């Protein structure tokens, strides 16, 4: 199906009970569903002859700490045959376990591991759900908005112990806010010169 409007109608008619909302923007179709329907909707998008979304481009998360359902899951699919993209989303609570797409798209394996590592979202039936980007024993999930800028621990090589060690972060000074006016900005004589030029014109 080459037309996004036709594709939107097709998906809404075929998956009536599984679609919460659809919208076309930026030449892409956005589909909002519930977590429970991710497997059925993904299978339809991949196998239906009029959709053929046979490539999973990415799995990622948006963190909204102020929301009751903190995380929004985002899946990006591509149909090479029809040159179309679909963005599939649903919201979940902080400690909710969600279905893995590895049985449908093996490429989801590392993408879901990255989401687990960076945000702490767990996937049911994932074949190897462990950290992929951070070090062994890493504390926390770095892309959550409540993760401290300095991290929880510092990993460094100790000359004394001749090995890599991990220890709590020690800040030598309190956090300082360097948001102040530069001496090169807003000087009085420049402001006066601009005002004088405005009066002349």
For each predicted feature, which ranges?
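Terminal low-complexity/charged segments
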Residues: 1-201
């Amino acid at each position: 199906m080459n037309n996004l409007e036709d594709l939107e109608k097709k998906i809404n008619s075929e998956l009536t009970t599984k679609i919460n909302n659809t919208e076309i923007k930026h030449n892409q179709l956005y589909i909002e569903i519930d977590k429970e329907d991710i497997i059925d909707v993904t299978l339809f998008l991949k196998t239906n002859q009029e959709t053929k979304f046979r490539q999973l481009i990415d799995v990622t998360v948006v963190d909204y700490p102020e929301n009751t359902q903190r995380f929004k899951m985002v899946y990006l699919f591509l149909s090479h045959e029809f040159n179309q993209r679909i963005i599939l989303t649903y919201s979940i609570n902080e400690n909710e376990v969600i279905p893995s797409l590895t049985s449908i798209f093996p490429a989801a394996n590392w993408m879901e591991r990255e989401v687990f590592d960076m945000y702490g979202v767990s996937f049911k039936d994932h074949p190897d759900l462990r950290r992929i980007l951070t070090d062994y024993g890493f504390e926390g999930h770095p892309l959550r908005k409540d993760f401290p800028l300095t991290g929880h621990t510092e990993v460094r090589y100790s000359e004394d112990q001749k090995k890599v060690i991990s220890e709590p972060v020690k800040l030598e000074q309190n956090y300082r806010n360097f948001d102040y006016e530069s001496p090169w900005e807003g000087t009085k004589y420049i402001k006066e010169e601009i005002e004088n030029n405005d009066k002349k014109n």
